UniProtKB/Swiss-Prot annotation:
Described purpose of this protein according to its UniProt entry: Catalyzes the ATP- as well as the pyrophosphate-dependent phosphorylation of a specific serine residue in HPr, a phosphocarrier protein of the phosphoenolpyruvate-dependent sugar phosphotransferase system (PTS). HprK/P also catalyzes the pyrophosphate-producing, inorganic phosphate-dependent dephosphorylation (phosphorolysis) of seryl-phosphorylated HPr (P-Ser-HPr).
Other remarks on this protein: Both phosphorylation and phosphorolysis are carried out by the same active site and suggest a common mechanism for both reactions.
Entry-linked Gene3D superfamilies: HprK N-terminal domain-like (3.40.1390.20), P-loop containing nucleotide triphosphate hydrolases (3.40.50.300)
Protein name: HPr kinase/phosphorylase
Chain positions recorded as ATP binding sites: G161, D162, S163, G164, L165, G166, K167, S168
PANTHER family assigned to the protein according to its UniProt record, in alphabetical order: HPR KINASE_PHOSPHORYLASE, PROTEIN YJDM-RELATED
EC assignment: 2.7.11.-, 2.7.4.-
Source taxon at top rank: Bacteria
Gene Ontology molecular function: ATP binding; magnesium ion binding; phosphorelay sensor kinase activity; protein serine/threonine kinase activity; protein serine/threonine/tyrosine kinase activity
Length: 324
């Protein structure tokens, strides 16, 4: 996993409010980070954070009430040996959760070794789950794409096309028809799972839509809270193309896809021409995609129907054989 620039300080700053973290020792270790080789070998965030485990010393170590109870039952010699082995390998930081006070000798050892030590009143399991989700997000593959990203009938749809084709105007019309804006112009996509890509709006462009001749429109202010969305999973790409009959396939036999972060996303192409109601066409494309996801393929059904008709016609014209 890619965790360049992720330090104890950055993790603390991003999660202090949610986890109610307090930094009690090891302030000098603010730049402490994951071991590079360990981070590269990690297959998921579950490898990067967990309960106290000396077998995996390079991950974030979370100590709840059971771990602290176990630690306090150890002899002083065993405490020094086990914590010495752990801290020697420089974990990013330690978290004492469940509202338990860290043992004084553990706090002292963290101070002397510049190992960040945090405390949290939240349960250790919740701390681990939260940090795993956080690390999954910041380490996930991501890309910024140009277009208008909308929630249409509950489906994340990215409208793309050359400049001047009317993407923003189309987005505005769809919003006026009750659909929701996620992002305009720049959309940040992040792959959070094997078949899960989430799109969000950069904070600077939140709720804004740029329309030629009108300038910037604050969609949330104009249309209300229900006209904007924070995030959506991308399921469909609508590519607007200029009218060029020589290159446009009216009835594509094979589904078209666009690769986004290594995942094929279903794509439809719509020609832009005078008199065409693009908003209705996009809504129809979304409804058709919903049917395809349910296993209903209109084109395939038509081809099967046509094939059956041709076979029936061929059978009706076949020679009947002669009686001898």
């Amino acid at each position: 996993m890619e965790l360049t620039g992720v330090t104890a300080q950055s993790i603390f700053d991003d999660n202090a409010a949610d986890l109610k973290l307090s930094w009690v020792a090891g302030l000098e270790g603010a730049d402490r980070a994951f071991d590079v080789d360990f981070a590269k070998e990690a297959t998921s965030a579950a490898d990067l954070v967990g309960h106290l485990n000396l077998i995996h010393p390079n991950r974030i170590q979370v100590l709840g009430k059971p771990e602290i109870t176990y630690y306090q039952r150890l002899s002083e010699e065993n405490r020094k040996r086990q914590m010495g082995e752990l801290i020697l390998l420089e974990p990013p930081f330690l978290v004492v959760a469940d509202g338990v006070d860290p043992p004084p000798d553990l706090e002292l050892r963290c101070t002397r070794s510049s190992t960040p030590l945090f405390t949290s009143p939240i349960s250790s399991a919740a701390v681990i789950d939260h940090l795993r989700l956080y690390l999954s997000r910041i380490s996930a593959p991501r890309v910024t794409m140009h277009g208008v990203f909308l929630d249409i009938l509950g489906m994340g749809v990215l409208i793309m096309g050359d400049s001047g084709l009317g993407k923003s105007e189309l987005g505005l019309e769809l919003i006026s028809r009750g659909h929701g804006l996620v992002a305009d112009d720049a959309v940040d996509f992040v792959r959070l799972g094997p078949d899960f890509i989430e799109g969000r709006c950069p904070p600077l462009l939140q709720n804004l839509l740029e329309v030629r001749g009108l300038g910037l429109l604050d969609i949330k202010t104009i249309f209300g809270e229900t006209a904007v969305r924070r995030k959506m999973k991308i399921k469909l790409i609508v590519q607007l193309v200029r009218r060029n009959d020589g290159e446009f396939e009216r009835l594509p036999l094979d589904s078209q896809y666009m690769d986004v972060l290594g995942l094929p996303i279903h794509m439809v192409k719509i020609q832009v021409a005078a008199g065409r109601n693009l908003a209705v066409l996009v809504e129809a494309a979304v409804r058709n995609t919903i049917l395809r996801l349910r296993g209903i393929d209109t084109l395939r059904d038509f081809m099967d129907r046509q094939r059956a008709a041709m076979q029936a016609e061929a059978a009706s014209h076949s020679p009947q054989g002669r009686l001898l």
